[in-house]
Amino acid sequence: MTACKNENVSKKCYLCILLSRMKKYLKDIVKLIIFLALGFFFVWLSLNDLTPEDRSQLWINARNAFSGNGWIFLVLCALIGILSVWLRGRRSVIMLEPMNYHVKSTMAYHSVMIGYLANLAIPRLGEILRCTILQKYEHVPFQKSFGTVVTERVLDVLICGLVFVAAFILESDRLTTIFVENHVADNIVNMLSGVTKYIVIAGLILIIVLIYIFRKWILQFKIVQKIKQVLLGFWEGLISIKNTKHPVRFIVYSLSIWVCYYFMFFVATFAFPELVSTLGVRVALASLSCVVIGTLGFIVAQGGLGAYPLLVSMVLALYGMGAEVGLAVGWVIWAVESAMYLMMGLLSLVVISFTHETTRTETVENHQN
């Protein structure tokens, strides 16, 4: 009788675990479908208003970018992208040092590159996978490395904001057109005007007060305790900035990453002779504007699919370029970057798997001897 009960309990536990995993996978699948649907919507949106002649010219422009000397500039674009990933890896090494975790630069690079590969498939999976790799191969606790990842994201937002401001100062007449014509600012103001604004503020205050009053009771839940541990890991990652042993190098790496993003686009523009000949020296400022606005495309759609080329085309239209040229530039640069992350990410997976297997074999042989 006892054996039957134990068997039933085991079956229930197994069923609960199975349902939990299915729920997680279902959420990931739904999230992926939503982001892909947005991406394909932007693809349709970018091509919908083009005439058959424009679509034909778009394909010709994209194909010509890989002919002649164009492929050299596109390869250089990919190499600069790889450099930006290496810089991210080096920056993460510096951030982990104050916590007494000395990660190899090669492993830091591979973890970041594999993270980019994962993000092509599922949003935000890359950050989790990156920390998991460091935990498995470099014995860095997940919370600690994830805290530094959050810190990196905060820094990236700050630097992106500075670049955004710089771009608007240099090209205010053109870039403000995107927001003015689409009434973005007006819509935001209207949403937070009148009674709605006060309801939102009152709701936030009420939530904060309730959390403070019932804080001791709330902290008794295991899930809250886990969240607390994660947040403590985040905090340690955040304060690691001021404790870094190489502050100058840290700042240089952070700025250099965004310099790489700029030159990835700028160099790739030389694969499009019509763009360079039309804009001349203005291609430098146009590249800055495209990098700033194009970054938004990676936020709204999976891997920037559809959204990135559309935004690049919108920016280049402000410089007098037709949609058949702007979309070709956006799609080619997006394709080159995505292909680079795909190939180098797969290569990094192979390298760390081979390295881990070799290390494990050597360890077993040493124990046997």
Language-model-derived ranges and their functions:
Residues 117-122, 144-169, 332-344:
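Membrane-embedded alpha-helical segments of transport systems
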Residues 127-136, 301-318:
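Re-entrant/interfacial helical elements at transmembrane boundaries that shape
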